C-alpha cells in the first residue's frame, strides 16, 4: 500500500460516502417487504436479520409488515471503514479498533482496546499493547513494544505536521505520550508516563515530563528491555 500523506487522508475522508452501518433483527411478514439490493438480508418467512446503511434500512422498518425489530449500531456518518483484519499475518485480539488503510507487519501483535488510525504503520514483530493509540500516520518499526495506554500522536490535522516515527527495537512503557513530529531512535527506551517532546537518540533511555535522557540502554539490565519472541508466534 502506498504511503498516505495528510492530504491523501483528508481527501479520503472528505470524499467518502458517509455511512451509518446497522444490523437489524426483524420479525414480521418478511416476504412482503420491498428490500433494496444494497441491503443484505438473511430471512425466513417471519424472522431474519438485515445489514446495511441506516438510510436504506429505516424505510423498510416503517413498513406495516414489520411487527418488531432490534437494531444494533456502532457509528454515525462514518467516513473511514474498519480494516479487514483477516488480511494481516498478525495476532489481533478482540476489541482492537483498526481503521482502513493501515499496514501491519508479519507476526505483529495488536492487543485488546488498541486503536490504530488511518495511515498508521506497524512493523513486523511489534506489539501494540492494551489501550494504546496510534494516531493517523504514526509509524512503528520492527520488534518494538508500545506499552499499554501509550499515545503516539496523530498528524492528520494540521496537515503540515510531521508523523511520529518509532524506529526498530524501541520499548515504550505504559501511558507515555509521544508528540507529533518526534522520532524515537533505534533501540531506545521510553519510561512509563513520559511525555516525549523532542527526538530521542538511538540506544538511550528517557524518562519524565518532558522526557530527558537518564542513561544509555547499555546500562540497563537486559531482562528489563527483552522482547519475547514467543509472544509473537502464530
UniProtKB/Swiss-Prot annotation:
Keywords: Acyltransferase, Amino-acid biosynthesis, Diaminopimelate biosynthesis, Lysine biosynthesis, Repeat, Transferase. PROSITE patterns: HEXAPEP_TRANSFERASES. It is an enzyme of class 2 (transferase). Pfam families: DapH_N (PF08503), Hexapep (PF00132), Hexapep_2 (PF14602). It comes from the Bacteria. Pathway: Amino-acid biosynthesis; L-lysine biosynthesis via DAP pathway; LL-2,6-diaminopimelate from (S)-tetrahydrodipicolinate (acetylase route): step 1/3. GO terms for molecular function: tetrahydrodipicolinate N-acetyltransferase activity. InterPro entries: DapH (IPR019873), DapH_N (IPR013710), Hexapep (IPR001451), Hexapep_transf_CS (IPR018357), Trans_hexapeptide_repeat (IPR050179), Trimer_LpxA-like_sf (IPR011004). Disulfide bonds: none annotated. Its EC number is 2.3.1.89. It catalyses: (S)-2,3,4,5-tetrahydrodipicolinate + acetyl-CoA + H2O = L-2-acetamido-6-oxoheptanedioate + CoA. Belongs to the transferase hexapeptide repeat family. DapH subfamily. PANTHER family: 2,3,4,5-TETRAHYDROPYRIDINE-2,6-DICARBOXYLATE N-ACETYLTRANSFERASE, ACETYLTRANSFERASE. HAMAP family: DapH (MF_01691). Catalyzes the transfer of an acetyl group from acetyl-CoA to tetrahydrodipicolinate. This is 2,3,4,5-tetrahydropyridine-2,6-dicarboxylate N-acetyltransferase. It comes from Ligilactobacillus salivarius (strain UCC118). The gene is dapH.
